[in-house]
Amino acid sequence: LRENKSGGASSIQTSLPARNIGLSGRFTYAYDGRYFAEANFGYNGSERFAKNERFGFFPSIGAGWMISEEKFWNQDLKNIINKLKLKGTYGLVGNDNIGAWNDRFFYMSEVNLNGSGANFSWGQDFERNVGTIDMIRYRNDKIKWEIAQKMNLGLEVGLFNIFDIQFDYFTEYRKNIFGERQTIPYEMGFSAPLYANKGEASSHGFEVQVDANHAFNKNFWLGVRGNFTYANMSM
């Protein structure tokens, strides 16, 4: 259970403690320095969503194979390729940090009882004024976690006990992105914006890192690192 409090809140809503609850676990497995596996999960709850959307389950898995530790990888190969490893991961990541801080409780409407859109005056000198009620936000019980699906495939290569090369290809697909609806006709009579989990985005790319290390003697060695990253995103 995690609780955050704001000391400079500007309203009753933002002054309330923010609370999240979560349960997580991790399982790892390794055999003979050759085979590796890992599984993680998170079961998280957020106060920002209605009861039917409050909790989300976000698992991930990963695996690796150290090919250079297999018996068929003889010494002649190791003198050239001293390390060869394949690895991959896939998982889901949830995000409840969406919208503005004033929009904490999406399942509750918010109104301003002293609205400035119109007011009424009466009395002999018209000194009595009553403001109207302004709608700030409409409730939406369907607002839920933003979810990112992430995948990574990697290759690690060691050459001549000098060079270490890492190559990673990654993809990410995000859905349920929170945003304002732009296609609501004025004839429907809404006086405040409408929000929903309406967006999607995807990205992919790769990253290459090369390290070179060489010891000239016991007192002098040299290390050099270079990397390159490419990423492309579409919405």
Q: Where do the protein language model's features map onto the residues?
A:
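Extracellular/periplasmic, surface-exposed regions of secreted and cell-surface proteins
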Residues: 1-235
